[in-house]
Amino acid sequence: VSKIKPTDEPHQAAVRAAGGIVRRPLAGRSRIGQWLRPRYEIVLVHRPRYDDWSLPKGKPDGDERDEDTALREVEEETGLRCALGAPVGETRYEDSRGRDKVVRYWLMEPPEGARAAPFVPNREVDEVRWLQPDAAVTLLTYPHDRELLQGLSRRGPRRP
């Protein structure tokens, strides 16, 4: 007699998503040996559907690679076409539908002159803000996003 109880629901793989920690330098604040300190600003997005502040991210289109998903989602949500940098880490949490979700993040930087490019609100994101890391941590809605950014501030990006 088997002691394994069958479940009514099939096993679901975690929901995959990818995004970016987009940074831009602040003029005149650079110091050798520091990575993510007040000399940089980080972009956060406000999503009206959830009334939350988060890092730009989203789900893949079909079999899209995570790196490509991250770049596309950052551009869709912020209007910034960025260069992909080092992997930063991942967050794991339960989404609003009770599913496990894993989001992989990469460091990204917009091209020179992106500061002057105007953001155009859309149905997913109605506001973006550039903030120094400490202020960004304070504004982020979710603990997993705050922990990721705080860890990055302490250690810098992961080495491949």
Model-derived regions: residue spans:
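Acidic, metal-coordinating catalytic segment for phosphate/diphosphate chemistry
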Residues: 1-34
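Conserved beta-strand and immediately adjacent loop positions that scaffold enzyme active sites
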Residues: 19, 41, 127
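Extracellular/periplasmic catalytic domains that process cell-envelope and extracellular macromolecules
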Residues: 36-37, 99
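Short, acidic/hydrophobic/Gly-rich beta-strand patch recurrent on exposed beta strands
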Residues: 43-46
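A short gly/proline-enriched turn/hairpin at secondary-structure junctions
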Residues: 54-56
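Unchanged
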Residues: 58-147, 151
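Short, charged, intrinsically disordered terminal tails
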Residues: 154-160
